[in-house]
Amino acid sequence: MEHRLHRTDRRLAEAGSVLEFYKDTMVLPDGQVQIWDYVHHKKGGGACAVPVLDDGRILLIRQYRPAIDRETLELPAGAKDSSGEDPAVTAARELEEETGYRPGRMTKLVHILTAVAWCNESTDIYLAQDLKPVEGQSLDEAEEIEICSFTLDELCRMIYAGTIQDAKTVAGIMAYRSMLAMEEQKEEQKKPDTQNRSDSPKRSDTLLDKMHRLILRARTG
């Protein structure tokens, strides 16, 4: 696809320790010239963990976010130490620092672009399992974090109720739920086929129907 919208100049307006703020000169398809804001994350972003305990409950953290002046419920997450750091390492480190649990197994769930209109930041989200407690939290000076745990159904209801609004947390929880539904579908497909073969076209709707039922259950409680 040919893009008629294009950038002709980028000027650094302000540089911080993590972010750089730029003014981009953009030429629109009709020839107009506009100045757009662009925020560059020096390390490219970070990583996030969906930490699942042995009993199936999921760890979240509650912390105050000055940008929105209120507390939020979030999955453990943080920025990479460098642009080249393996995001799985980032996610495991942040999980241990913020919750005091070390994961024995990490599985990639999704990669998300958090603000494509004006920033290059991305977040890699991992499922963290086989959690082992370590010495405790290792927080930065400015961090005040309360550790909470919820069932998956509770978290889905909280998302639909608007209690959980953090984008990476919504993405991580729903990706985990989708993964479980797909795994259950695969197990069902392994079972001996006792249905008439003429019914086989209906099988393609099974996962979609399953996800629809899960969503309705989460909304209604």
PLM regions: where:
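Acidic, metal-coordinating catalytic segment for phosphate/diphosphate chemistry
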Residues: 11-48, 54
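Acidic pyrophosphate-coordinating catalytic loop
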Residues: 12-17, 29, 41, 112-123, ...
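Nudix hydrolase/Nudix homology domain
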Residues: 1-5, 71, 141-197, 201-221
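Conserved Nudix-box catalytic region and its N-terminal flanking loop in Nudix hydrolases
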Residues: 2-4, 9, 39, 44, ...
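Short loop segments at secondary-structure junctions
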Residues: 29-31, 53-57, 64, 129-133, ...
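Unchanged
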Residues: 45-48, 53, 79-167, 215-217
